[in-house]
Amino acid sequence: MSFKSIRLPLALAALVPLMAASTRAPLDLQPESKLTISGTSTVRAFQCQATSFDAKVESSGSSAVAAVLAGEKAVSSVVVTVPTEKLDCRNGTMNEHMRKALKVAQFPTVVFKVNGYELAKATDGVAVTLNGTLTLGGVEKPITVNALAKAGENGTLLVSGTQEVRMTEFGLKPPTLMLGTMKVDERIKVGFDVILKD
């Protein structure tokens, strides 16, 4: 076997990962996306909104939105990062206590990383089961998040859902305000409307 006949297959083999990488494409997070944290207390309910967050979503092709809506697993990775200081509860005192409870000074971000997922057809879209890890207050735990994906405006993909999280499971103490008369329940709900576009 000649040197040239060996070199050709080796060159082709070297191109395979490059070709695979070139087909990966990010899905862009749209500014209309929303993420909220809501809960109850001994006095009243509350809701905090993330004024800024990031979602890095990579797909295995250039038409991932259409593929996902068709029930195809076209997304290859998902990492959502929320700067905890960007949570706004529309109340200065509540903001201060919530940020203290989430240990913002030590752990400035909340991170959700998807390790695997399943899709299933639903009457109003595609049911999505996300299996991943949630890092909150410096503690990482496995979590399963259920969501619904459906077509949004202007060719976008809207992924919506609500997930309950217990603060104490992550070593966090729920906020207490008004000299202890207002105690926040340890169960908070994370709601999201993530809008993505090819």
Name each model feature, range by range.
Residues 1-10:
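Bacterial N-terminal signal peptides that target proteins for export
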Residues 9-18:
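Bacterial N-terminal signal peptides
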Residues 21-198:
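Low-complexity, acidic/polar, glycine-enriched regions of mature
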